[in-house]
Each structure stands twice: as structure tokens, then as C-alpha cells.
Amino acid sequence: MAGNSYGTLYKVTTFGESHGEALGGIIDGCPSGIELDFEAIEVEMSRRKPGQSAIVTQRKEPDAVQFLSGIFEGKTTGTPIGFIIPNTNQKSDDYSHIKDNYRPSHADYVYDQKYGFRDYRGGGRSSARETASRVVAGAIAKQMLPEIKINAYVSSVGPIHLDTPYQDLDFSKIESNPVRCPDEKSAAIMEEYIRDIRKQGDTVGGVVSCVIQNVPVGLGEPVFDKLHAELGKAMLSINAVKGFEYGSGFSGSEMKGSEHNDLYNPDGTTKTNLSGGIQGGISNGMDIYFRVAFKPVATIMQTQDSLDNKGNITPMTGKGRHDPCVVPRAVPIVEAMAAIVLADFYLINKTY
């Protein structure tokens, strides 16, 4: 199976399955001499880990990171950083009923067809548990770029939207509620909606918005390696993501050029920022902002038709511990992937 690595100079490879012994990763290209804040890494992991509230999966995992290489006396050595995250709370029996069956809208069928064999326990390699390794790599990338501030938050759950412009939000309130929405009133409505969906044995999707501030001018490469193209690739690689838009996004297609152009100030900043901080695929120094759409979790606690490996349509009811809505736990994953992309382009920029 290829496709387990991301990046050019700051290169991240992840490994492991949801119900295997451990997850893990290798970070290649991290500069030497970075004094790591291990507590900050733990904070990022705790934001993503399961079992943190009543509106996420109740699988309990400490997600304790064990670093194996690339760090000495608390500093990066410049050699590959290897780490593992032990799995401690697997319940593989919850998945015995899908050993010979393919769950609707999961990767079960395509994995079996492509590889001729699959780990059906918890989705195996296709499980969102893989993203724990990305959060480790993203936490280190954030410490490479301390001046850059990355804040993601939940801006919609199902039909409930937070329409307040990000400039008017207090990002310090993102972690004040389990939904990770910085508007308390909207967060309460979203949380109640998720609880109701869970009671119905169903799931719901949502949108995570992300704002990146203090980005220097010049990150990104023209043509095929544009900054927004790499951000889009990184976000679309996250489990359950169905869409990505930055700046004015699709709404920009309804505007006139005279309305959409970002006019300059004498210092090179722009009066508006419909470009989303990126022009010609290169950061322009303005805030980068984008939105990531997540589908509803495919496993629902209702009976639906399934397909078995003999070609028979069979009824199936979801079992196990699953998120009724992924977006609260997706917030740190979106931040991590954004940090990885920026760290990679930062190192590429130093080659000029």
C-alpha cells in the first residue's frame, strides 16, 4: 500500500491500524535544535483523542506519544523523528459482524477489491484513528513556526451555521465547549443537535473553518505546487472530508471582477481579502482562511442494506463506538495538516 507519506522536505509518514498494537509515524526533515514543548504536544493530542466528551466516540485512549528517535535532551537532532502511540482500548469483537460484509459508504469494499485482503477491525488503515499520528507531526510543525498562528473551529453542524465573520470571533473561546465553536450560543444549539442525532442512532456532518495569521509573503510554488493546492490536498486527505474552499470560495464565482479584486494599500497589504491570503499560489501576507466540509459518519446505529463478499444484499446494523459528528475532533486535525503544509513550504523557501 503506497500513499502513506506527505511532504517534500518536511516529510511525514504514518503507519498503524485502528485495532493494531500501535499507531506511529516518522518525521523526516525537521531541522535540528528545536526545543520541543512536550506538554504542548500532549495538549494537541488531548484535543483529538476519543472519549473526551459525551458527543464523541466513547472509545477511551490515552494517546500517549512515545518518541523513539530524533530527539536528544529535549531538542530535535535533525535526524528522523520516530514515534508510536499505543492502542490500549480496542474492542475488535464489535466488528466481527462485518468480517464478510461491506458497510455502506465505508472503504471496506474498495480495500477488498484493490488489495484482496483487509483488516476489518475498526476500519484498519482507513480508520480516522490514523490521524493521531498527523497531530503529532502537526504539533511539532507548529513549534517550528511559532510566529504563525493557526486557529480552526467548528462553523457548522448539519443545518446549524455560525455566520459571524472570523474577524469578529474570540478564538480563545474555541476550547470552552465540546463542539469547539467560538460562539457560545451557536455551540449550545450545535451540541444539543448532535445529542439528538445520536439518540436517533444517526450521524451528522459539518464544516471546520481555519484561519492562519502572520504568514510571511512567499510561501508556495507556482503552477503545480500552489499553496492553496497543497492545503486542499492535505485537507482532502483527512477522513470524511468532502469539500475544501478558500478565500471567497464558490461564492466568488457569483461576483464581478470589480467586486472581487483585493485593492492594495501602500504597504502591500490589501483593503479586502477575498483572495484568502493567497495569490498566484503564493502567500501574500494576509490572513489565510479556508473551510473544510465533513460528511456524516458512515456507521449509524440503524439497520441498512449491506453487501457481503458473496454478492448478497444483507441487512446490517452498526455496532461499536463511533462519533455521531466528527467535526469537534477534526478541529486539531485540520490545524495539524495546515501546519505540516506550511512547515514544508517554509523549508522549501529556504532553498532559494
Swiss-Prot record:
- Reaction catalysed? 5-O-(1-carboxyvinyl)-3-phosphoshikimate = chorismate + phosphate
Q: In which pathway does it act?
A: Metabolic intermediate biosynthesis; chorismate biosynthesis; chorismate from D-erythrose 4-phosphate and phosphoenolpyruvate: step 7/7
One GO biological process this protein is involved in is: amino acid biosynthetic process
* CDD domains recorded: Chorismate_synthase (cd07304)
Q: Which cofactor does it need?
A: FMNH2
- InterPro entries referenced in this protein's UniProt entry, alphabetically: Chorismate_synth, Chorismate_synth_AroC_sf, Chorismate_synthase_CS
Q: HAMAP family under this entry?
A: Chorismate_synth (MF_00300)
Q: What is this protein called?
A: Chorismate synthase
Q: Which organism is it from?
A: Flavobacterium johnsoniae (strain ATCC 17061 / DSM 2064 / JCM 8514 / BCRC 14874 / CCUG 350202 / NBRC 14942 / NCIMB 11054 / UW101)
